[in-house]
C-alpha cells in the first residue's frame, strides 16, 4: 500500500529536512516561508524555534552546524537581506554539519514589499542555490542540499517561490536517516574570518564554486529531455511546470542547481537545438550567464522580469 501524501511545497521541505536528519531549525515568520517552520516543529526529534529576526535565525543555524549537527534556517526573500552578514561570512568559513537556508521568493508580490531574486544575493555571497519544481522535488532536493553542503563545505540555499510553497502535490515520504554529529574541531584558520584567514578562504570559495559547476554537469539534480529539437528550453523551478504545459513537445534542460551553472552541459544542450529559449521568473540570472558563454538565446526579450508566468 502506497504511503504517498498530498503536501504543500513548504510542508514537503520540512519533511525533507526531517528525513535528512536535521536536529536544529531556526526561522523568522513571513509569507511565503512560514509553513516550513510550522511543519518541522511537529517532529519531536527537531529543535525548532522562531527567532527574533532572520539574522538570529541564521546565526543559530550556523552555530549548530559548526557544532556538528545538520541545521536549517528559513525565511522569505527580504529576510535574507537581514541575514546577509552571517551568510556572507559563513560562505567563507563553510560548515561542519550540513547547513541549508530555505528562502522563499515572492514573484507577483503577493505579500511582500519587493520582488527581489534570491539568486542574485546568492551569486554575490558565492553560495550555491537549489530550486525544486514541485512538492516531491522539494522533499528530495532538501535532502540533496544537505549532502551537497557537507560534500562541498558550504551553506546551500534552497530557493522556492510563492506558487511552489503554497501549491500541493504528491509526496512519497521516506524514513528519517540521522547521520552521526560531526566532531567539532578547534580550527581558527577556518572558523574565524579575520583578514589573514579570510584571504585564504576566499580562494577556497572560488575553487569550490568551480568544482561544483564541473560536477553539476553529471548531477542527478539537472535533467535533460530531448524531444523536438527545433526548440530547446532551459528552465528551473516552478517555471518548468509552465514550460511542460505550454511546450509539451520541446526539448528541455531542467536545472535543479541554478548556481553555479553547469557550463559544459548547457553548451552541449544548446548545440543540439535549433532555437534556445530560457524561461525563468524574475531576473535573467541564467540567461546572462548563458549569453556570457557566447550562446545565442532568447529570454527576457520574450518574457517580463515582473510577476509570475
Language model regions located:
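Thiamine diphosphate
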Residues: 1-135, 226-227, 285-287, 292-309
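Flexible, low-complexity linker and terminal segments
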Residues: 2-10, 132-309
Amino acid at each position: 500500500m502506497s504511503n504517498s501524501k498530498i503536501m504543500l511545497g513548504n510542508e514537503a521541505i520540512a519533511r525533507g529536512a526531517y528525513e535528512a536528519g536535521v536536529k536544529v531549525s531556526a526561522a523568522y515568520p513571513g509569507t511565503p516561508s512560514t509553513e516550513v517552520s510550522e511543519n518541522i516543529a511537529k517532529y519531536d526529534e527537531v529543535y525548532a524555534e522562531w527567532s527574533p529576526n532572520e539574522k538570529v535565525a541564521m546565526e543559530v543555524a550556523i552555530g549548530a552546524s559548526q557544532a556538528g549537527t545538520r541545521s536549517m534556517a528559513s525565511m522569505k526573500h527580504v529576510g535574507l537581506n537581514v541575514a546577509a552578514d552571517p551568510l556572507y561570512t559563513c560562505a567563507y568559513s563553510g560548515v561542519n554539519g550540513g547547513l541549508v537556508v530555505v528562502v522563499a521568493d515572492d514573484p507577483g508580490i503577493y505579500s511582500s514589499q519587493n520582488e527581489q531574486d534570491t539568486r542574485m544575493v546568492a551569486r554575490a555571497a558565492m553560495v550555491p542555490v537549489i530550486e525544486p519544481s514541485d512538492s516531491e522535488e522539494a522533499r528530495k532536493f532538501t535532502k540533496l542540499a544537505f549532502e551537497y553542503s557537507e560534500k562541498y563545505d558550504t551553506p546551500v540555499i534552497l530557493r522556492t517561490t510563492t506558487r511552489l510553497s503554497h501549491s500541493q502535490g504528491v509526496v512519497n515520504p521516506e524514513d528519517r536517516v540521522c547521520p552521526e554529529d560531526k566532531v567539532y574541531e578547534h580550527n581558527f584558520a577556518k572558523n574565524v574570518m579575520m583578514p589573514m584567514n579570510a584571504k585564504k578562504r576566499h580562494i577556497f570559495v572560488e575553487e569550490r564554486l568551480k568544482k561544483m559547476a564541473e560536477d553539476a554537469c553529471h548531477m542527478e539534480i539537472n535533467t535533460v529531455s530531448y524531444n523536438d529539437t527545433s526548440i530547446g528550453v532551459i528552465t528551473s523551478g516552478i517555471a518548468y511546470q509552465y514550460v511542460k504545459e505550454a511546450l509539451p513537445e520541446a526539448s528541455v534542460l531542467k536545472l535543479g542547481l541554478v548556481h553555479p551553472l553547469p557550463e559544459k552541459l548547457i553548451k552541449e544542450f544548446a548545440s543540439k537545438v535549433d532555437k534556445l529559449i530560457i524561461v525563468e521568473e524574475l531576473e535573467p540570472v541564467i540567461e546572462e550567464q548563458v549569453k556570457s558563454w557566447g550562446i545565442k538565446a532568447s529570454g527576457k526579450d520574450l518574457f517580463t522580469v515582473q510577476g509570475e508566468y
